[in-house]
Amino acid sequence: MVILAGNNNFLDGQTVKTKNIYNELVRKYGEENISKIDTFNWKKHPIYFIRKCRKELRNTENLIILPAHNGVKVFVPFFNFWNKFYHKKIFYAVVGGWLPELLASKVWLTKEIRKLSKVFVETTKMKEDLSKLAIKNVEILVNFKSIPILNEKDLKYEYSRPLELCTFSRVMKEKGIEDAIDVVEKINEETNEIVYTLDIYGPIDKSYVDRFEKLKNTLPSYIKYAGCVDSEKSVEVLKKYYLLLFPTKFKTEGIPGTIIDALSAGVPVVASKWENYADILVNEENSFLFNMNDLKEFENILKNLKDINKVIEIKNKTLQSITKFKSETAMQVLYKNIEK
């Protein structure tokens, strides 16, 4: 079996999901039966890379690819072409919810996607949207994290002010980082009290580095950048927090790993309603939801949640809602197709 994956130490969702799938395949089938094609910096040695891809496709029965926005335009047609000679199973595991929107304007790529053995998407809506494009070879492989789920007896129920909030995603404007900062500042200033603190975790998007450096210099003491956390340590870090904030502006998010992290740690989420939110979040069950870009609604939710009892009431439901996103459950659909 071969998996096409970048061999790097990035902490973005694409890299984390790729590593999670690779690690679960190794656990299931043994490292000696899994070969990895490293896509990191492949353009520096294109001839070597192309030869390796051909060789690996020829020598395997199952190829799993996880290309993102740019890679899908290259790797799907490339492997489809060579597969005319080798007739192997090619599976595409999509990271995020963006693929239907991309394909809607690219008929040629839609035709290529139809040729794949199976396309695994993260959400129900993605499957429905691809079906409208006459792509029928689709199944749902929910995003998952190979992390422990907090034991219910270890849930935190005692809180005092200031209440600790955090974000745990890529640091960029489109993830709503500035909205989170603005809302927390406004609530604290209006009450003339530090009701909330905010810790910002995650890799800083390269397009946002300069802006964020300037922004950090203006932040009050109760808001700080807390750096990056290894994926496997997320539950341990997050479990102390009152709420995780996810005010994303990306409407095509899939099942964000940060949401899985928070719920696995027993931490309810305050999130904007992206297209696929309903596949993982239920308002006032494991989360508190507001319409995307509605800062007033976001602010009102946090004002309302100064009442600690409203959060404590749903703490145990966060753990109950995460079961289907456990690795051993999520991967069954991929194993089934590999072993056909």
Give the label of every model feature segment.
Residues 38-41, 168, 196-211, 227:
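Glycosyltransferase donor-sugar binding loop
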Residues 239-253, 267:
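Acidic donor-binding loop of glycosyltransferase active sites
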